């Protein structure tokens, strides 16, 4: 089996996999792909076009012609900067909804694979190691306790780690976990050949170092 110059990092929402993947890519000089961003973009694009998230035929057509551009650290949709707009909890739930549609996943699959060049790639998502890059050199399932993930998300958006707003974040994370684990197509789960990395008690720096140490031993 020919291995691909890819580190695939999968895991649940708000586990820190995006931050870790981006830093690992920078350390190695590899490109970085946030596969979840494509699903979030699809959900946002469908919303803007007035298409329901469960309308498989129309959402899959929108996914095929997604007018998205990744420029440095910004993400553009039809020329509009939506870098922050796709990170809301509502769009996250939309992404989870469209990700359950087989035709949408098929529409986005080749687009994700096209990000791989000779330079190398670090990709994060929910099925990057199992479906998108099954021949990745290193596969990691990165996770953390749901309350820890909720606390990290709360700090990220500047709200206290208690009260109704925090409970809503925790509830949203747990609801998305449930949806991702139980979807019929590419459900979220650790693959047999993926290394488990629980970051509940680790800093970002410690997590990045762990991933790099593992990769250098591949």
UniProtKB/Swiss-Prot annotation:
Cell compartment(s), UniProt: Cytoplasm
Kinase keyword on record: yes
Domain of life: Bacteria
Sites where the protein binds ATP: 11-19
UniProt EC number: 2.7.4.25
One Pfam short name: Cytidylate_kin
One cellular component term from this protein's GO annotations in UniProt: cytosol
Database matches in InterPro entries: Cytidylate_kin (IPR003136), Cytidylate_kinase_dom (IPR011994), P-loop_NTPase (IPR027417)
CDD domains in the record: CMPK
GO biological process, one term: pyrimidine nucleotide metabolic process
Catalytic activity: CMP + ATP = CDP + ADP; dCMP + ATP = dCDP + ADP
This protein's UniProt keywords: ATP-binding, Cytoplasm, Kinase, Nucleotide-binding, Transferase
NCBIfam families: cmk
Protein name (database record): Cytidylate kinase
Species this chain originates from: Neisseria meningitidis serogroup A / serotype 4A (strain DSM 15465 / Z2491)
